[in-house]
């Protein structure tokens, strides 16, 4: 998701949290343990958006703690425009910003018997 100034939102929450709480429409989903590998522009495993070190990454987690550490690590490896959402997804939700809810699958059930 591109936000003001062309920044891109990266959601590092685990799958179970995104499933339970919803997704941020347009956010790039990269779980925390893959973040540096996927965003560094010289990495063989980089995503297409990771074109150079000047990309403005906005990292979001659930409460803002993991994203603060992740953004600091990104800055440490040269991605100097990286930052995070203070308060994380909880603050995002409290601000009533867009959230995409997943449709829960209907569990299978037995068909009525025919006699």
Language model: regions and residue ranges:
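Rhodanese-like catalytic fold shared by cysteine-dependent sulfurtransferases
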Residues: 1-8, 12-56, 65-115
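Short, surface-exposed ligand- or partner-binding patches at beta-edge/loop junctions that are enriched
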Residues: 60
């Amino acid at each position: 998701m591109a936000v003001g100034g062309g920044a891109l939102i990266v959601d590092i929450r685990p799958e179970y949290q995104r499933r339970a709480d919803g997704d941020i429409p347009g956010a790039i989903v990269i779980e925390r343990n893959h973040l540096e590998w996927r965003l560094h522009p010289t990495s063989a495993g980089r995503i297409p958006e990771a074109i150079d070190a000047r990309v403005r990454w906005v990292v979001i987690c659930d409460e803002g703690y993991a994203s603060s550490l992740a953004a600091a690590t990104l800055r440490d490896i040269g991605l100097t425009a990286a930052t995070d959402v203070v308060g994380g997804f909880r603050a995002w939700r409290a601000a009533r910003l867009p959230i995409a809810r997943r449709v829960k699958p209907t569990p299978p059930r037995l068909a009525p018997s025919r006699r």
